Amino acid sequence: MSTVTTPQPTAAARRKTLYFLTWRWHFYAGLFVVPFMLMLALTGLVMLFDDEIEQARYAEVLNITPQAQVMPVSQQLAAVQKAYPEAQVTQFIPAPQPDLANRFSVLFSDGSTQFVTVNPYSAVVLGTIDRSESWYEWANSIHGTLLIGDWGDYLIEVAASLGIILLVSGIYLWLPIDNARKAGFLKIRVGSGARIFWRDLHANLGGMLSLVLLFFLISGLSWAGIWGGKLVQAWNTFPTYYTWGEKPQSVLTHADLNHGSEKEMPWNLEQTPVPQSHHHGGEHEMVAVNPQFGIDQVIAQANALGFTQYRVAFPRGETGVYTVSANTMAGDIVDPRDDRTAHFDQYSGALLTEVTWQDYSPFAKAMAAGISLHQGDLSVWNKIANVLFCLAFILISVTGVVMWWLRRPTGQARLGVPPRFEQDGIWKTGLVTLLVIGVAFPLAGATIVLALLLDGLLVSRIAKLKVAFS
């Protein structure tokens, strides 16, 4: 009795099957990711030039002539309060250079927030800048939420998470594993036809910038609502219980000190409650009140602690505190090792707590260091590099669309999905990769499961859909 054996696939056949399996997932991920990649790169370009755009738009209320004598900040504050008696001053930001005006963030009764600019040499109010109308605010809101709130944030997180799949699959497709890929590795074949040219440009540019793209994806995901806010940021939030002891805490968090979509507080402090001032009228305790303690004394103490460029948040209510912060998240400084946040009792002037770089977790330190790179704040060369990266990401996205356009089935209602080659065992390799990424990035995992369900329940069972997705 003879035994029938199933021939084992050759190594070349297995590589071919794995190649097309990877290409299919690269294609599907790209369908979702490319529009978001273009949006993120374009809004990122606007945000990179925020300072230049703002100074051009509001030159008359920002540019001043430096003088020898600077007026006390308390006098500048008084001028703002006199000019806008019904408004509440919430923040003071000293100018980063002597030929620019200081800023006071002012909350008006209609809920709008504006910067009131003041000449620090004369304490004269120069004008206002509507914070909600800045190009940065507009671009940052699109960059983070698509202007639709949490659902926009979730969609961007899905795109960034699937971007990891796009990146991993793209690297595999680019590596010179077989002769076909070796022929175009690290070279662009101009005379071999349009499809080869665009493929080489797309693959080599994406492959060479893969680590840069991974950096932008991971650092960007750290701000996202699920992976960032619920997982990574929560794990790295500053441990106030053990460090701040029994000091009273409010329900106000550091994130509440941000303005709009602007991130002004350190990433690892955003979910941490802000300490409270000891109200001098308490029933069980009397705290020494310093009637002379105000913004000038806050700044003097901040300077004594080592603050250079910073911002001051004013107390909110009777138990509020003065918060002085200098961090890379807000762009106050570029060296993450100088990150520092301090809270002062508004009555006694006592330093309630101080958090510095040394207190950060390893991931929080990585975020503080990475944010300057992400925002192009380190130097003019960092900004130029980020501009080139944004343009490269746009080119990678466009070349991907061009590649699809050139190989799409013309005259047919078909998407042009890369072909499938069935082979026992190969699908497990792809599935393991997808599972690892899906577990590491929950929204990517949920999207993959949804895609598989739609494929199994609808696409594979409805003839027209099956043809369209082929």
Model-found features: residue ranges?
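Conserved histidines in hydrophobic membrane contexts and catalytic metal-binding motifs
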Residues: 1-470
